[in-house]
Amino acid sequence: MAIDEDKQKAISLAIKQIDKVFGKGALVRLGDKQVEKIDAISTGSLGLDLALGIGGVPKGRIIEIYGPESSGKTTLSLHIIAECQKNGGVCAFIDAEHALDVHYAKRLGVDTENLLVSQPDTGEQALEILETITRSGGIDLVVVDSVAALTPKAEIDGDMGDQHVGLQARLMSHALRKITGVLHKMNTTLIFINQIRMKIGMMGYGSPETTTGGNALKFYASVRIDIRRIAALKQNEQHIGNRAKAKVVKNKVAPPFREAEFDIMFGEGISKEGEIIDYGVKLDIVDKSGAWLSYQDKKLGQGRENAKALLKEDKALADEITLKIKESIGSNEEIMPLPDEPLEEME
């Protein structure tokens, strides 16, 4: 539909004035601006990358990863840091919980020598550091662990029995208002790790669970990932890891509510090889005959753990099967459901 010529002139004049005051590009016609593809940082999990729809977590956005204790929240975040560093990214870890295991991070592939780490005393200090490094323009990814540990200064300075209603929620709301635009401008990804709490006096319908830090983060986050431990992995009666399910409960860059399941092995993190086998079997790329798993004419091993061990050693073969899986799923990146039952017994 054609726009009136007088209106066009008025709009053009207004755009010029806005450009003078706020800088070029402050207001643009969408048709004049090329729509850029959303860049992403891999999560280190094939299934979760597919579930997110763009191959990982989006750059320049706020991400929330939440779930119960020992569900894999920090492990997933450390994998994202490792993937970002592999592509030359600079990463920071704001350890508000003062609980970062450097040796574990290194085993997950994190370049700990070049990882920026802060262990702030208060929530205000943590968020000031976050804002400063983001505004520098030199950082690609920041992880805050965790929202629950961002304790307001007034609460730290007060007595144990003092009531500080809504202080943390106001702190988060204020910080997110300030930093959202900066993150987009600097193309910096911000990941908040969060814990869950039970709603007091919850009656009737709805989930009794909620996340800490108020409602602001729920609104500002472009992606929210709920991660849960769903089973224990055992080998010869020995507990060797956990099976985790990650659900994308909010996604502003692709369809939400997709899920992914993966193994988190103790001391190793997310098992990429396990996902390759799961998706390979589901898509008939990997053959399963009894307990034996094979790819084309090559035997991968008897049992899932043996096949995983072979793929861990043969990176070229693992990459080849991964490529076949991605091609099979297709360019629309529709997530394929995982097997209804694990390939080996779990508890």
From Swiss-Prot:
Keywords: ATP-binding, Cytoplasm, DNA damage, DNA recombination, DNA repair, DNA-binding, Nucleotide-binding, SOS response
Signal peptide: none
Single GO MF annotation: single-stranded DNA binding
GO CC terms, sorted: cytosol
Transmembrane segment boundaries: none
Subcellular location: Cytoplasm
Keyword DNA-binding applies: yes
Entry's Gene Ontology BP terms: DNA recombination; DNA repair; SOS response
Binding site for ATP: 67-74
Function, in words: Can catalyze the hydrolysis of ATP in the presence of single-stranded DNA, the ATP-dependent uptake of single-stranded DNA by duplex DNA, and the ATP-dependent hybridization of homologous single-stranded DNAs. It interacts with LexA causing its activation and leading to its autocatalytic cleavage.
Family under the similarity heading: Belongs to the RecA family.
Protein name per the record: Protein RecA
Source species of the chain: Helicobacter pylori (strain HPAG1)
Gene: recA
